[in-house]
Design a protein with these regions (language model features):
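Short beta-strands and strand-coil junctions in structured, solvent-facing domains, enriched
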Residues: 9-11, 29-34, 51-54, 66-69, ...
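Short sequence motifs at beta-strands and strand-loop junctions characteristic
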Residues: 36-37, 126-130, 139, 162-166, ...
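Residues on the lipid-exposed face of transmembrane beta-strands in outer-membrane beta-barrel proteins
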Residues: 48, 60, 136-140, 170-176, ...
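Outer-membrane beta-barrel channels and translocator barrels
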Residues: 53, 131, 142-143, 177-181, ...
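Outer-membrane beta-barrel transmembrane domain signature of Gram-negative proteins
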Residues: 111-139, 143, 287-291
Length: 291
């Protein structure tokens, strides 16, 4: 369970890390007593930044980072896979059974350009990820009124080609104390994000199972689709369309009256809006058998 400024949220992926001032994790019985069965796996309590008394302060932050694969799964190269296929063919010819689907004579034919390649598919579909984040915030206030406003933009180019994530968010936090015994405030969060993804399970399966000596392009330059029952990961990366646009808005208002140091009254009002729009297209080139 995630609690942001006292409000339970189903998903916190829209929160800008630069908006967070503190985070606490609860796993004891007290959390269950407060939040019930929803806290069975623990509670994450997040508090966002508030304005501080004083002159307005403007902060601009920019961060750039890189990401790479920490480990690559070892794969057989062309020579190793041909040797395996040769042993496999001889085994089936000797003992029967199986379904050998290639001829070593053809695969070793140096004039057959379609099979005379040595592909490292994982290397072909991955690259160094680039991440950029920009935040512009302003905060300040008086003894009675404090405010904090932050707008952030995050852009990530994925490690897998043609994947990525973008997010634009704005947070407006305000607190007003007209008297020593009355407090009120609001927390407004607006987020738009766009994700460009792929079916990673299908893609990585093709990377690990497709023979390295199968060409990815025909002589005319067009991409090979499904060949010999095996999908072409290069075609999957280039022709899969999978975009998800997410719109999120969260409005929170509180009103508090302190009767004494032991007793106070607090009312919370919260409204949430979520909308996801997904566009996905997988052409027959990457799903059907094309020779």
């Amino acid at each position: 369970l995630q609690i942001v400024d006292g409000v339970p949220l189903e998903c916190i992926d829209g929160i800008n890390t630069n908006d967070i001032t503190s985070m606490e994790i609860l796993k004891d019985a007290a959390s269950a007593a407060i939040y019930g069965s929803r806290s069975a796996n623990g509670v994450i309590i997040i508090t966002t930044k508030s304005g501080q008394e004083g002159k307005a302060r403007i902060d601009i932050k920019y961060n750039h980072s890189w990401g790479t694969l920490s480990h690559k799964v070892p794969q057989a190269n062309r020579k190793e896979r041909l040797l395996y296929d040769q042993y496999r063919k001889e085994y089936f010819e000797t003992y029967g059974g199986g379904n050998p689907d290639e001829s070593s004579d053809i695969l070793n034919d140096p004039l057959n350009s379609f099979f005379n390649v040595d592909n490292d598919y994982l290397d072909m579909i991955t690259s160094t990820a680039q991440k950029d984040q920009v935040d512009i915030s302003v905060g300040g206030g008086t003894k009675k009124l404090k405010y904090f406003i932050n707008t952030g933009y995050y852009n990530e180019k994925g490690i897998i080609s043609n994947t990525g994530f973008q997010r634009l968010n704005t947070r407006i936090n305000s607190d007003y104390s007209p008297t020593d015994w009355m407090n009120m405030g609001s927390r407004i969060s607006l987020t738009y994000s766009k994700k460009k993804g792929l079916n990673e399970g299908t893609l990585l399966s093709a990377v690990l199972t497709r023979r390295p000596y199968f060409n990815t392009y025909y002589p005319d330059g067009s991409l090979v689709g499904v060949f010999n029952g095996q999908k072409n990961p290069i075609a999957q990366v280039n022709y899969t369309t999978d975009f998800t646009d997410s719109y999120k808005a969260n409005f929170f208002q509180f009103f508090e009256i302190k009767f004494n140091k032991y007793l106070k009254f607090r009312a919370n009002i919260n409204a949430k809006f979520y909308l996801d729009k997904r566009k996905k297209l997988e052409p027959s080139l990457i799903t059907d058998e094309w020779q």
